[in-house]
Amino acid sequence: MILQALTDYYRVLEQAGKIDAPGWAPVKVSYALLLSENGTLEQVIDIQTEQPRGKKMVSAPQILSLPAPVKRTVGVAANFLCDNAGYLLGIDSKGKPQRTRECFEASRSLHEQLLAGVDSPAARAVAAFFRSWDPETAREHPALAEHLEDILSGGNLIFRTLDGYVHRDPSVRRAWDAFYQAEGDGPQGICLVTGQPGPVESVHPAIKNVAGAQSSGAALVSFNAPAFCSYGKEQNLNAPTGKYAAFAYTSALNALLADREHVFRVGDATVVCWARSGERGYQDVFQMFFSDFYDETDLKGLVGALCQGNPVVYDETKLDPSMDFYILGLSPNSARLSVRFFLHNTFGGFLRNVQAHYDRLEIVRPAYDKFETLPLWKLLSETVNQNARDKSPAPDLAGEVLRAVLTNTRYPATLLNGVALRIRAEREVTRGRAAIVKAYYQKLAETTKQENPDIPEEVLQVSLNPDASNVPYTLGRLFSVLEAIQASANPGINATIKDKYFNSAAATPAVIFPILLNLAQKHLKKLRSSNAGLVVFYEKQLTELCSRIGKAYPAHMNLPQQGSFQLGYYCQTQARYQKKEEAKDV
């Protein structure tokens, strides 16, 4: 399914002229070898370009469309018209002269084979260069002196003449296309992607730009041990992929990964997305759905229309909510890639799932919180110790949460456990943590079609529900009031009852709340002399909340009940702060 979707995407891009034709690929190139008509090396030209990197401009290799490079392992394998100094000049800095000589001879043989009979000045110049070039004296060549150190560092080189780059010569291009398309004597089979008979690739082109993978590229399809092979087949012949399909899916995936505007990280996974039509507008809108500026009114209106099934125009592109949309998450695994997830739905279907996720997360927010909706990265950060050196969330958790959001399924239990752990460790119920508790139990009830009596719908509200009769929720509200009483009686106090009693109050209320209520009476007595009206206000709150609890406090509370407690505490606290803000405004 993955290879088929990527191959279809390649066909769309090729028809639109947005990707290289079969046999050609984008390659990073640093220098051009300028040849005379008789093949003499005249000059080494630096073709690197200035590109932004952070706040600086740095020289970086230029990306050109060149004959598709081979995927190298430990053997010697030459590329046509573009390679490193070891293959094109017979010199390198690896200290293995015999192997370097073998590389040069392989390159010489390949170019002589392909350029034989090609009638063009560019082809004749390259052929003459390989006939006359002597690797033994190459380091002393005057044309190499200026850039010798950089050339030996491993950057790619290409050929050019006074008429232009050799790889752009029409006769040379035809020679390469004929060579690439020739079936040769390789293995034949039925392609598992296209279903067509023809040559199948034993080694597929490398996938590059996956965070954490080798810079030279990694394999998406790979069989490197006998235990993975069947029926005596070797390497990728165990998953027979035709030459065209192998090139198409790797080219499409590399194009997606090279488009840094539409690549994002979730944990250790590198995530790409695409629409079957190949239009970038779908990627733009999907990316913005997870960005910090999703709250912009025009974007929310656009997404709302798509969620309702209505086509919209974005950046001069008509977006169809029924368009097939794909999301692929890849993680590095040595020289290979692991598929973290692969999701397929309509574009509107994905947006509706994400919008439902945001709706579940909606909860009253503090005045200082600038995020109207909680982006995924901020959500995951609620499970991490912010004082730790590594503030990254668990890689598996990040992928599982994203999958749950995109497929509208249950959130992983590890998300709730991570939040519960941070609340116990820090004794702090932030907006994000309260939102996660609310969303987790809302989705659980929706999935099981059964309300949990320990954390019912009446407590899973956006803001404070003063009519809720749930005892754990009421205990959370009561704890917030007791904390407010202490703060009023002792302004500027360093440690409050939350620092000492929050966890135990949520777990064993019968033990802790009598202590807290006794302490509150002392605080009220102290406060009565300075603000009797405030004492009356607090006493009314205590009377109301205690009457909802009944005669006995619960001896123990389980995890869902503690979730109700945390939501009650958070909503009561935010309601108190909102009243203060409103009083200031008046």
What are these regions (language model features)?
Residues T194-P197:
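Short Cys/His-rich metal-coordination motifs, predominantly Zn2+-binding knuckles/fingers
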Residues S202-N238:
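Short microdomains enriched in Cys/His and/or Lys/Arg
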Residues M1-G184, F228-V586:
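Conserved phosphate-interacting/catalytic interface
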Residues G189:
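Cys/His-enriched microdomains
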Residues V200-S202, R336:
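Short catalytic/ligand-binding loop motif for oxyanion handling, primarily in non-cytosolic enzymes
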